[in-house]
Amino acid sequence: MDVPKIKDASWRDYQAKLQRERRYKDRKKFMRRKVKFVLPVLVVCLAIYGFISGSFGSLFDDGKKAQDPKPGKQQVASKKAAPAVSYDKHEIHHFIDSRHFANLRDNFFEIQSNGRRLRVQTSIDPSLQNYLSQKLDRKNSSHIGIVVMDPDDGRILSLVGFDKANPSNNPCLDSSFPAASIFKIVTAAAALEKGNLRLDSKLRYNGRKYTLYKSQLKEKRNKYTHTISLKDAFAKSVNPVFGKLGTLYLGKTQLESYASAFGFNRQINLEVFLAPSQTVITDEPYQWAEIACGFNRQTTMSPVHGALISATIFNRGKLIEPTIVERISDEKGVNLYQSQPAVVTQAYAPHTSAAMRELMKTTIRSGTVRGTFRKYRR
């Protein structure tokens, strides 16, 4: 399928656009904060913080019953009427599926449901979506899935996929792909919180970085032993180090607990059905090592879930519920669905997020993806 070219499109242009929009949003937020503090008696401000319990009189008078200044006239509420809502995320699955989002070019589409024509407004950024679609290597790939997400609220800005065998399929929503080293994020959070480790904690391993043999899980020191910090082991994706974290520091219980906290083996709500990511942890210590470093094909996940896991770094450990449909309205413009930000779990403690962010930064600066990001450095 040919994708229309974007005139003078470039990654740097798009980044500059995002920065301008971010500065504009920051200015708006600043002005809202000023209004909030200068005019704290406004009903809107009081409603935001939950201080209204019925009337201003109950907050400011001397205990006497508040009097209506103009008896017989209804007071006008300052809060806007809530939009009419008929559907929740699960109900939307009945008339929207992954095919509607197969390389969507616009940020909306229309469908027929129960004799009604519905307009579905998505969170997709068309310019970013089209840019990424142009960059797909369809010739040399069997599957590609690219998900771009706003970590603040879980809005999916781009959902670009390619399946050579089934063009109508969207791999971004397919939960059958091996999680591989993405699971090291889960293991790292568990090690920092339950393994009593720090970023500069020294860890040892023998053999190669990207293998995982049972002999590499033994605690031994000789002239071939390598010493590495937790931070560098993460950045360079050292399998035997993370295998040891699984067997010697965490074990089955902690691995299961943190896997669940990061969204594995649970249903994550999205407006289109998203099968749960899977991991099965047995009683075998070597299997704990395989799970902890992602050296297996049994731990599976979708690209959308991968983006959610990365977003915890920016949300102080919160796993945010994703959303791709902002609203659904009927022919008359009446809202039938409105997305709302929601938290799935607290994957790790807020104070751990700074260390997790440093792990990700080190991976970009000196780790396995250094070459990929080199040309984008300022």
List each language-model region with its residue ranges.
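Gly/Ser-rich catalytic serine loop of serine hydrolases
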Residues: 174-183, 298
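Beta-lactam-recognizing serine transpeptidase/beta-lactamase-like catalytic domain environment
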Residues: 3-7, 99-102, 146-169, 195-378
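Short amphipathic alpha-helical face segments that pack within enzyme cores
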Residues: 181-190, 303-308
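Extracytoplasmic/periplasmic proteins that interact with beta-lactams or build/remodel peptidoglycan
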Residues: 2-145, 166, 339
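Short beta-alpha junctions and helix-cap segments that line functional grooves
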Residues: 132, 172-173
